[in-house]
Amino acid sequence: MATSAAAKDDDSPATRFAVDQLKSIIERIERLEEEKKAISEDIKDVYAESKGNGFDVKALRTIIRLRKQDPNERQEEESILETYMQALGMI
C-alpha cells in the first residue's frame, strides 16, 4: 500500500505525462462509444423506416452481411449451402 500511495504523490513530469495520456485515451474511447451508440440508433431507425416502406428487414440484414464478405468466400458459402439443401431434399 505504501508504494501505491507514493505513486499517487509522485508529481514528476513523466508521471504527469502518463496520467494525462491515460486520461486522453479514456476520454477518446468514451467519445467514440457515444458516437457508436448514436450510429447504432441511426441504423435501427433506417431499418424501421425500410420496414415501414414494405421491405423485409431480415433480407436487408442478410444482404448487408453478404456485401461485407469477400466474393470468393461468399460464393463458397453459397455453394456449400446449396449442396446441403440438395442433400436434404430442400431444393
Curated annotation (Swiss-Prot):
Q: Which GO terms describe its molecular function?
A: DNA binding
In terms of domain of life, where is this protein from?
Bacteria
> Membrane-crossing residues?
none
Q: Which NCBIfam families match?
A: PRK13694.1 (NF010247)
Q: What family does the entry list?
A: Belongs to the UPF0335 family.
Name of the protein: UPF0335 protein BRADO1188
